[in-house]
Amino acid sequence: IEVSRKQGKTALAAALCLYYLIADGEDGAEVLLAANSKEQAKIAFDMCSKFSKGLDTKGKYLTAYRADILFKATNSKLKVLAADDSKLDGFNASFGLLDEYHAAKTSKVRDVIKSSMGMRENPHLCTITTAGFDKTLPCYQLRTVAIEVLNELKSDDEMFIAIYSLDADDDWRSEKNWMKVAPNLNITVTSKYIKGQVQQAINNPSDEVGVRTKTLNQWCDSATVWLSDESIIKCTQAVDLSKFRGLPCYVGVDLAATSDLTAVSYLVVDGDKYYFKTHYLSLIHISEPTRQEAI
């Protein structure tokens, strides 16, 4: 599940965890609520604790402790798990929830939860997150597979996918597109708030990535932006290099040794300076699928 901030992700995570703790119909259920740090996990756990006290005001069935919740009727337990915990083994999860997976540097915690489910008859693993700005991390890889499943390029009948995101050709500044990323628009977050955030990003390019990833749930390629894409596009034009034949030209080359692109930049001097950049991918790399997929 991928959706922007202020859409009730934490409440949904807490509700799912408590459902699988109480109503999954499995004796000795073990629910793992996982995050990238103890502080992050505590936010979701505090919501679980609050909900549990609302469900069972007298504490007859549900008992909330500092880092776990016990459901006495079936001897089931909800536990908090963080990537920075010293011990990440010995679990027997019936349900696992990964919160804000976009920030996970590795898939270690997800792998631990999945591998602990082998003895369960009906285990479930839920990943819930906003977009991020590092497409090399496990979350974006999982997202890529999910989209391939949605597009029927891959098959996985056990995978439920909900991605609330802009389409590739959508203008992130256009108010008509915001409903795509905010299913709770004007319920848990107002159009006025999003409009203010977007205007802030337009006025200050350094805020653009934060607004696009968190408010508009759009994956970006870096944590900060010095110049916006629109500013760069306005400064570009199509130029025919052959028209500069005979003029001084400086060439810079960045060769690719493994799976990267080879880049060549040309600087032609003719009173003013003209920059040109070209990328190449060698035929041998195209013929090697594993390298091609790494680009």
Predicted regions located by residue number:
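Carboxylate/His-rich catalytic cores and anion/metal-binding grooves
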Residues: 39-41, 261-283
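Phosphate/NTP-binding elements of NTP-utilizing enzymes
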Residues: 1-253
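Gly/Thr-rich phosphate-binding beta-strand-loop-beta motif of the actin/hexokinase/Hsp70
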Residues: 245-268
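Ser/Thr- (and often Asn-) enriched beta-sheet segments in non-cytosolic proteins
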Residues: 68-70, 275, 295
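Residue-level detector of conserved catalytic or cofactor/ligand-binding positions
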Residues: 281-295
